[in-house]
Amino acid sequence: MQSFLQEVAADLYRRYGEDVSSLHILFPTRRARHFFIDALSHLAERPMWQPRWLTIDDLMQEVSGLHSGERIRLIAELYKVYSACHDEPFDKFYFWGEMLLNDFDTIDKYRVDADALFRNIYELKELESDVSYLTAEQLEVIRQFWANFTDGATLSEEKRRFLAVWRTLGDVYHGFRARLQRQGIAYGGMMQRAAAERLLAGDFAFAERRRYVVAGFNALSACEKVLFRFLQHNAETDFYWDYDDYYLKNTDQEAGMFVRENHASFPPVVELSHDNFRKEKELTVVSTPSNAVQCKYAGRILDALRTGADGRKRPLDKETAVVLTDENLLLPLLHALPEEAGGINVTMGYPIKTTLAYAFLERLVELQAHRREGREGTSFYHVDAAGILAHPYVARSAPQTIEQLRRTMLADRRIRMTADELGQTPLLKTLFTPAAEWRELSDYLLRAVAAVAREPYDGDDARQRVEFLAVISEQLIRLRNSLEACDIEITTSIYTSLLRRHLQTVRIPFEGEPLEGLQVMGILETRNLDFRNVVLLSMNDDNFPGNRVAQASFIPYNLRAAFDLPTPAHHEGVYAYYFYRLVQRAERVYMLYCAHADEKTTGEQSHYIYQLDFETGFRLKRVEVGVDVNLAENPPIEVAKEGDVWEKLSRFVDPESPAMLSPTAFFRYVACPLRFYFYSVARLKADDDLTEEVDAPMFG
């Protein structure tokens, strides 16, 4: 198998030799660079300089002269413009302000006439604004959603306020762009549009002669097409397209939707191999009852791939990839990989939201959210306090003190405990300090994280603990700086919401060599890369391709289609290309899906699997995996009636002994002798739960 990047490297080296180092190369992903350099290193006869690497964003920024702004700051600037037209607090604006920013971004990337689009939206909403048929309950939902309606508003007033939002979208859009332009920052779409307009006006030229290589792109926005035309006519540019004739020449195949246009508009400098779908492939479809079984079975597949023709096991190399269409399966998959698999390169990073450090931060946030101020000072809710005390980062710091606090809480039935009662050590005093305003909460979280990081810790995850806490501390500072740059007052609740949303997207990169061992990656990272063996997980139709076109948008579907904005059909074409491009050079492809249907999934395999089965002529091997119900037997617990045990039992039948069997103990003995032993002989009792209501045992 010769990969796409190997073919590109071979052609460039054949044509330019060591002058390849003078080229400016654009790939869709940064990871493609590593594989390209590896391919080039096998061709070069002596050491040479690398080519110059660029991304589309780098070029757009160079041409436009604008810089990308932090997302939180962009939404804050959008709010300042929006609030001039509508009286709405930032807390309520933020989350649908994100939706508005996404729409503006899409409008600019596709160079849509914003005034015409917003005028159409307003007219469409005016037709839809007759609310006379709505029930009182439905009207109440509308009032709560917009937060603009008052209980005493008339129907016509509701209609007026409803339409006012849509009428001002154009003004907000233009005002927002002008405000950002004055500050020299932009969102992605605005930067692309500014660059495209400058190129079309002839106001930009490169300061020096450049030769570009554009390789492996697929779906292009209108602004990106303008950039590529500029490179085509104003710089020496070589285009390479990664496709197969199977879907390029078949106009009914959605995988070729974009590459057909690209191939015609930007002809390739040379034709590479495009007949890989004619080659023999081993395609296997695996139906599993759960995601956990998917991961386990993927481990078995990888173990089988390690076995060579001579029967010996060998480590897996970069020719094998596990592709996660649902990145939530990363951790279960890592636990299911065979220990002898060799090196593993994970491209997606470790999600911070699954770490103990993030759980600790959540405990702190909940602790402050439920605190109360009273005559005795600040008090904390027992559930939050107990959670902090039980967390591994805290429990090992002063085990005796913490155990005594826990016992006091249970024995005295303390629903709330004061900060003075809980702050028995320097660490606990730091953790149980009140923080009201959002800046105080931010400072408090930073102090708490730093205090925990300084504590001695002898757990197996000591190194990871410090790294995770350092990442959280860094993200807290970044969020604080972004919010202060916005110059907008927010509530503590909106701060905690922003903090959660921010941290849940943070991933910690794994350390490793990208060109060694098994490759574990998401579907987007596979662009331009080819593998001999591919294992695809979560190949359910509602997940892959699914429907990732944002449902929350001000732009309805019919107007998206009319103005050539991305629609579900666009999304379908993009993901069909990802799939078929990944399969085209592979020799073995395993497609696993969960056949279990519930409220979240239909259990249906991806329609791409059906297409392979009925349209390509390949024979698909199908495997159904069940659940192993042969559970390991637990040995029975037996306690011999001898020695000390017999002496304790004899007390209950000795007429001179004060020990007696209560009715409850006798019933327990009849129901389960072992339970009787634990309660009445060994005196083992579970800790009482701290209840907030008077239950039957407490009432008597």
Model-assigned labels for residue ranges:
Residues Y393, P566-T616:
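C-terminal accessory regions
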